[in-house]
Curated annotation (Swiss-Prot):
Signal peptide per UniProt: none
Keyword annotations: ATP synthesis, ATP-binding, Cell membrane, CF(1), Hydrogen ion transport, Ion transport, Membrane, Nucleotide-binding, Translocase, Transport
Localization annotation: Cell membrane
Designated gene of the protein: atpD
SUPFAM superfamilies noted in UniProt: C-terminal domain of alpha and beta subunits of F1 ATP synthase, N-terminal domain of alpha and beta subunits of F1 ATP synthase, P-loop containing nucleoside triphosphate hydrolases
Cellular component per GO, a single term: proton-transporting ATP synthase complex
A Pfam family hit: ATP-synt_ab_N
Record-listed ATP binding positions: 170-177
Source taxonomy: Bacteria, Bacillati, Actinomycetota, Actinomycetes, Micromonosporales
Protein name according to UniProt: ATP synthase subunit beta
Enzyme class (EC, first level): translocase
Amino acid sequence: MTVSATADGPAGTKTATGRVVRVIGPVVDAEFPRDAMPDLFNALHVDVTLAGGEKTLTLEVAQHLGDNLVRAISMQPTDGLVRGVEVRDTGSPITVPVGDTVKGHVFNAIGECLNLEPGETLSPDDHWQIHRKAPAFADLEPKTEMLETGIKVIDLLAPYVKGGKIGLFGGAGVGKTVLIQEMITRVARNFGGTSVFAGVGERTREGNDLIAEMTESGVIDKTALVYGQMDEPPGTRLRVALSALTMAEYFRDVQKQEVLLFIDNIFRFTQAGSEVSTLLGRMPSAVGYQPTLADEMGELQERITSVRGQAITSLQAIYVPADDYTDPAPATTFAHLDATTNLERSISDKGIYPAVDPLASSSRILAPEFVGQEHFVVASEVKRILQRYKDLQDIIAILGIEELSEEDKLIVGRARRIERFLSQNTYAAEQFTGMKGSTVPIKETIEAFKKISEGEYDHFPEQAFFMCGGLDDLERKAKELMAEG
């Protein structure tokens, strides 16, 4: 059954056929000719028959065991796979389609399109291997640049870095999906850019809901989606982020576009790596994680960066197991993050959207050398006022606001106005709220919050600050409310 190389693989490379000698769940051992052993990370194909139907499984070579044996991890369930069947080396790693044709479509980790209509075919610009090197040091963008989103709370208090990685924290129902859709819309409108969404090990229902909501809001045509959900084998969940990142790299490097890459959830990437590591028989490291945790995370994160002119900016939803921030999985992720955006239920309960916690969110570029002295000073003052308001909450709850000093009463009034002015209508929610989304330039945001902090708008009613855009919008609403009052 073990045969020498006869078939032509990609780019004319000779490929070999072998036979399956052992199957243990998603782990498959195969024997190949000594002179035609497949390389590490090469994709292997096996035809299996199950319930009267035929399908082709894709495996990825993970280890060379000696005695002409390789150990591979399956990217699909191995039901129907038996010893002795032929296995073919494709001669290259897993490849995925790239280019404009992937927009509006859903793919799995091995590049198969999952939402083609009957009779519809996909004609991609090219196919790229998912295992790629990070950009060379000489090609990286030397300057640190802020990604202006037009969302006041983010731009002022936790600004994003072009080509940076942002951690997105938040439970169910606090507006995470809306924020994701909003960023996709803004990148397309403001930069003419593209978004790629990687669903890594999350619920199939959530993935389906996201597709439906994106279709309804019209952003699906600007987005490519790659899914490896929690019912998939660990090999798929480990590779789906790389498949999505490869599509994003094509938009950045070939089409010279700004790209937004969403990974939901980066913890599941680590979790899948732990499962694969155990299946391969490696000795576990701290808390049972794989010994290669930092290496695997680095290989993914270092490819997400700015090259000269264009950038892949990544928003990564992060699940923190048992809220333990010292757990190796989130701790390893934090080392790569440039900013964090915390979505807080107590803020969404007030009807303030985006429900970003201004005190818990942070950014490494919120410093004078990156954003300028005025931006830094205004942001610091806004945080100081909000922190003082938070400190006074218990006193207000027990004794009432009348018991505060005159200075503290002023701070509470300004904090409540700031809190409401941090809310903003979004493009993604236009069809639900009936109110048009707004983009506020960073200069206007800084000017507005400076005036609020200094008390210039203390005479404006609090309601005027709620869900408005820039200064013009605020002053118009205030005049209307004061005229009514």
